[in-house]
Design a protein with these regions (language model features):
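A penicillin-recognizing enzyme superfamily signal
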Residues: 1-160, 169
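Short, low-complexity, Pro/Ser/Thr/Gly-rich segments in the mature regions of secreted, periplasmic
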Residues: 173-188
Length: 188
């Protein structure tokens, strides 16, 4: 991006700074970041595809996404630094390795070093804007958890959109797709 044109003395001839406009509701942006944070963690819902970066010693608050097409990708960010790693061939042939195994380790090593630099060391947790609620969700039924639920996780929702039903343990369990399409436990 061209920011400005200057004289040899540094005087500005013309500025080309963009006129920033908010195009995404901050609550929706936060929900996306929250989902991408889960990519880097292991919990009762399973292991995120990028959870290995934590095992490699990167501990700062961050979010990310792995990717595998013909190439291997990992895109991740902290509150003040974005880094995208691509591992691939220049002839569009498959690299035959996932982003979590090829690109994420490179990302983790770079970010561990980058957050040691003064300009990137002040990483902060991602904070939820007003209008985002956190609720405890049962990992089997994807409903609100209660004392009968053996495993649960906290999830972010737009205010007023969280599930209202409580998990039905120890009754019949249906996964999210079964609930969406109205199928019972046996696919009926």
């Amino acid at each position: 991006m061209l920011a400005s044109v200057r004289t040899p003395n540094g005087d500005v001839i013309n500025d080309y700074l963009p006129d920033p406009k908010q195009v995404l509701d901050p609550r929706v942006a936060y929900l996306t970041v929250s989902l991408m944070q889960n990519v880097l963690h292991s919990d009762v819902t399973g292991s995120g595809t990028g959870a290995g970066v934590r095992n490699m010693g990167f501990t700062s608050p961050a979010a990310g996404k792995t990717g595998t097409s013909h190439d291997a990708w990992f895109a991740g960010f902290t509150s003040n630094l974005l880094c995208i790693v691509w591992v691939g061939n220049d002839d569009y042939t498959d690299v035959k390795i996932e982003g979590a195994r090829a690109a994420a380790p490179i990302w983790a090593e770079f970010m561990k070093r980058a957050v040691q630099l003064p300009q990137y060391s002040d990483t902060n947790n991602f904070s939820a804007p007003e209008g985002v609620d956190f609720v405890s969700i049962d990992s089997v039924s994807n409903l609100l958890s209660d004392a009968s639920c053996p495993a649960s996780f906290d999830a972010a929702f737009l205010a007023g959109t969280a599930p209202t039903e409580t998990c039905d343990h120890p009754a019949e369990h249906r996964n999210l797709l079964q609930k969406i399409f109205g199928l019972g436990k046996n696919g009926n």
